Amino acid sequence: MKKWSILLMLTAFAVILSAAVQPVKPGEKVLFFGDSITHGGRYIAFFQLILDSRGITGTDMMNAGISGGSATGGLRRIQHDVIARKPDRVFILFGMNDVGRWRYKTDSPQNLQNRKNRLETYTASQKKIIAMLKAAGITPVLMTPTAYDQYQKDETDNLRCNEPGLSDVADIVRKLAKEENLELIELHPYMTDMLKKHPDLQLCGKDLVHPIHVGHLVMAALLAEQTGLAGPVADVTIPVSGKVQSRFAAISGLKTAPDRVQFRYEPERLAVDLSIKIYNVEIFKNLETIYPFHEKMNRETLRVTGLADGNYSVKADDKELGIFSAAQLNSGIDLGKLETPNRARSIQAMKSAWAFYNASSKPRGLVQCRLLIASGKYGTPAPGDHQAVGEALDKWLADHKPDWPYRKYYTTVVNNYKKNAPQEAAMEADLIRAGKKLQEDARPVSYTVTIEKTR
């Protein structure tokens, strides 16, 4: 924790040079503009979950990521994919595809020149993106890139040399934030530090580029921290005699005695469930080793002081949560770890966040395919003419050699377009429903707490 605090202080100094990141306001529309890391959208869904579970109501976290995207490529779609959607703020996350990681394998004169050229192109494109957003009355927010996981203990044959390129990108982003007086979100230093400290615990996949589930939750947590959302779910102290102290929860109907306390507990926030399994695998199993999520975001403390010595039954409504000593209650118990009525809601909210992620990432494949044929070389079909777009995509795919290394991937992308495009309107409706359900499920319920000495 000490090393983490030092890193936080050093990075905070860099952030001071840019504008302070403003909290997300109720009803705010925020769009995330980036590459495949954003296209997948898990960190966006997790961030939406954190906002909803903390009562920041009516927000809309929108996905404008495209697999293989770059800052230069972003310029070609910014008008229809970003500005036309009328967000209040746009969080910009490019860099991974801009540097050309194969250029870092050796320090040949040609590679050194190519690195320089690519970074200059990236800088120029980012400046144009910033200018276009400002001209449209939209606030740009810059994000340093995620880390390149060249430290993981894996025998995968992939380039393990790209971190200097991403560090250069991070420096460019910081410089632009300072020059333009823009808000800045730092991902790169924190995630790089985690990877270096825990090479045995993968934060990214075997391609060393794309964060896995736990990496996306770390991204969301860093976003939450830097937009002012860190802190407990609740922190409540109830003395048997004296004044109640409470953060993020209301206490009503309080009745106290030396061996019995009862009250109505009305929390404002909901803990984030970390127990979810995908294909029977605990996807957040190693989270606390990498990032102190519970301490920073998930603690829900209830203290009861002044009780007579002994053991006490703690109940939520009529359900017993456990037996605790007076000393334990005096120090504080963590309601977020107990089977309160909100435990089930927390589990459901994470499932709803997962549904929101699926609903928000699926339409991005349609945008991706339309961009593949945007040059007009394969015709200029209307976006809504799904059959004509599919035929143009077939021509585009046929233009690539059979041994093209990305043929299998793009064949799947094109086939998915043909399958999903006719349901585009239904997909958009599903996304709206998924967002509403997540907001509903992420709200806590109130319940009666009874603490009584056991006989």
Identify the role of each PLM range.
Residues V24-K25, A45-D60, G69, G73-R455:
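Alpha-helical cap/lid subdomain in secreted, periplasmic
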Residues L17-V21:
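Boundary at the C-terminal end of the N-terminal hydrophobic targeting segment
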Residues E28-R42, S67-S70, V99:
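Catalytic nucleophile-elbow at a beta strand-turn-alpha helix junction centered on a G-D-S/GDSL motif
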Residues L7-I16:
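Bacterial N-terminal signal peptides
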Residues I6-L7, A374:
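General helical structural elements
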Residues M1-W4:
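Positively charged n-region of N-terminal signal peptides that target proteins for export
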Residues F32-F33, N63, L142:
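A structural signal for the hydrophobic beta-strands that form the central parallel beta-sheet
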Residues L8, G34, F94:
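Residues that line or immediately flank small-molecule/substrate-binding pockets and catalytic motifs
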